Design a protein with these regions (language model features):
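A short, Lys/Arg-rich alpha-helix, primarily the initiator
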Residues: 1-18
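Short alpha-helix boundary/capping motifs
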Residues: 6, 45-46
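Residue-level signal for the short linker/turn that defines the boundary of a DNA-recognition helix
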Residues: 10, 20-21, 47-50
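Short alpha-helical DNA-recognition segment
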Residues: 20-39, 54
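Short, conserved catalytic or interaction motifs in soluble domains
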Residues: 42
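DNA major-groove recognition helix of helix-turn-helix/homeodomain DNA-binding modules
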Residues: 50-61
Length: 61
């Protein structure tokens, strides 16, 4: 799936890049795999509700 049409994927990647964080760093903080974070950012899957809350806290949004 192309993330250009997925605002959630776009926002997740933008927030991570804005903070200069690696996929590995975000994955470690959220206790998920690097592949899971990449899938969220590519629009291939969505984080569950608990991970959405953790993402909001991590990115302070």
């Amino acid at each position: 799936m192309n993330n250009q049409n997925n605002p959630i994927a776009n926002n997740l990647r933008s927030l991570r890049n804005r903070n200069n964080w690696s996929l590995e760093y975000v994955a470690e903080r959220l206790e998920v795999s690097r592949q899971a974070v990449a899938k969220w950012e590519n629009g291939d899957s969505l984080p569950d509700v608990m991970k959405c809350d953790a993402l909001a806290s991590l990115y302070d949004v």
